[in-house]
Regions:
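Catalytic, metal-anchored helix/loop core of enzyme active sites in primary metabolism
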Residues: 146-150, 158-161, 165, 177, ...
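Rossmann-fold NAD(P)-binding glycine/threonine-rich loop
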Residues: 81-87, 91, 100-138
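A short hydrophobic/small-residue beta-strand
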Residues: 94-96
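Structural motif
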Residues: 7, 73-75, 98, 105, ...
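Substrate-binding/catalytic subdomain of NAD(P)-dependent oxidoreductase enzymes
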Residues: 175-272, 277-279
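A conserved regulatory-domain signal marking ACT and ACT-like small-molecule sensing domains
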Residues: 310-401
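Rossmann-like NAD(P)H-binding beta-loop-alpha module
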Residues: 68, 115-196, 203
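N-terminal glycine-/serine-/threonine-rich beta1-alpha1-beta2 phosphate-ribose binding loop
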Residues: 1-91
């Protein structure tokens, strides 16, 4: 019998216990032994819950319990999660987490601590919810050099952009709808301002390129400035607007990395990824394109990914899975030097003159009074920003390459 402890008994933590109990026979066959939730750490009590009598409030009762070999962290945030996970690893316990904030901020350090104590620090559920992407990057895609990772990494914003596109709703209305459905938090900033996607693309980039990418180095724009008028133009163009997290390897060994809304055509592999679904596109020099698609969030999909890490640790307790990070921090290039084509909306009616300045490939009319849209030539961000200062620009959306 393998005993596990769960840190944090909220949505994901209770989902983990639910999966462990509901699928205990299947899990036992795959793990080679029965896996039992021995206790949960939480300041709250849970009368009537299946774990009612197994709630502890002191982390030392877990770190000092020799019968507990695997710890599952689902608390979220970095305080006190970081201190608790560090203590568990130092106590010789494998740790599986769904906490993207923890992994993005402290991943390299926790991996080194795990390595020093001959245990594993596993975080499959920290990026794609139920999408298996971490292990393929670490274990499966090892014979090829990854050149790019692009993903729709946040279900909340993808749902909102889908509703804006399909129903013609404006931002405020679709945010309220997402909150009523439980897709968006009461304070939605982490999702709608792109911070969630930024942490996820930083984690994926670190694994894909083998060196720690600091999420704070990733230039980020959210979806708060996207309007129904932008979608009117997108419809004319046969395009959709998505929030992408993208990183690309450069010839000098650095990477470019960005989170921002992009306009994509139906030729793009992520065009049909709608509603709360997520997808991650991995490009390699030899393998071409690989796509990972599924539920990027949610109680049971995320819990299932956490339990998969637990099963792996249980099945191979003496094999420590360590992501191959090189020492130091990856250099992320200045986003102002990156090159894009842009969709730009401009006030006025003199489209031809403005189009000439932007070297526009196309003038777009969406039937909106006193403005027009352009598809520009490629410009660096610096060059484009300087051009925009000369005109009454309403909005700008980059075109996905």
């Amino acid at each position: 019998m393998i005993k596990v402890a769960v840190l944090g008994y909220g949505n994901i933590g209770s989902g983990v216990v639910q999966v462990l109990l509901k699928n205990k026979e299947t899990i036992a066959k795959k793990a080679g032994d029965e896996i039992v939730p021995a206790c949960v750490l939480d300041l709250r009590d849970f009368p009537g819950d299946v774990m009612e009598d197994k709630v502890v409030k002191d982390i030392n009762l877990i770190t000092q319990n020799p019968e507990i070999s695997i710890v599952i962290e689902t608390m979220g945030g970095t305080k006190p999660a970081y201190a608790f996970v560090k203590a568990c690893l130092e106590a010789g316990k494998h740790v599986a987490t769904s906490n993207k904030e923890l992994v993005a901020a402290h991943g390299p350090e926790l991996l080194e601590i795990a390595k020093a104590h001959h245990v594993s620090f596993l975080f499959e559920a920290s990026v794609g919810g139920g999408i298996p992407i971490i292990r393929p990057l670490v274990s499966s895609i090892t014979s090829d050099a990854v050149t790019e990772i692009t993903g729709i990494l946040n279900g909340t914003t993808n749902y909102m952009l889908t509703k804006m596109s399909e129903d013609g709703l404006d931002y405020d209305a679709v945010l309220e709808d997402a909150q009523e459905r439980g897709y968006a938090e009461r304070n939605p900033a982490a999702d709608v301002e792109g911070h969630d996607a930024r942490r996820k693309i930083a984690i994926l980039s670190s694994l894909a390129f083998g060196k720690y990418v600091d999420y704070e180095d990733v230039y980020t724009e959210g979806i708060t400035k996207i309007t129904s008028a932008d979608f009117a133009y997108a419809k004319v163009l046969g395009s959709r607007i998505k929030l992408f997290g993208t990183s690309k390897k450069k010839e000098d060994g650095s990477i470019s990395a960005m989170v921002c809304p992009v306009m994509i055509t139906n030729e793009h592999p992520l065009f049909a990824v709608n509603d709360v679904m997520n997808a991650i596109l991995v490009r390699g020099e030899s393998m071409g394109d690989l796509m990972f698609y599924g539920a990027g969030a949610g109680k049971l999909p995320t819990a299932s990914a956490v339990v998969a890490d637990v099963v792996n640790a249980a099945r191979n307790p003496k094999i420590t899975e360590i992501a191959p990070y090189e020492p130091g921090k990856m250099t992320v290039s200045d986003h102002l030097k990156s090159t894009h084509s842009y969709f730009v909306r401009v006030k006025g009616s003199d489209a031809n003159a403005v189009a000439e300045s932007f070297k526009a490939k196309q003038i777009v009319d969406a039937g909106i009074a006193d403005e027009f849209g352009l598809i520009t030539a490629e410009w660096t961000e610096n060059e484009f920003d300087a051009l925009c200062e000369n005109y009454p620009v309403v909005s700008v959306i980059r075109l996905a390459k």
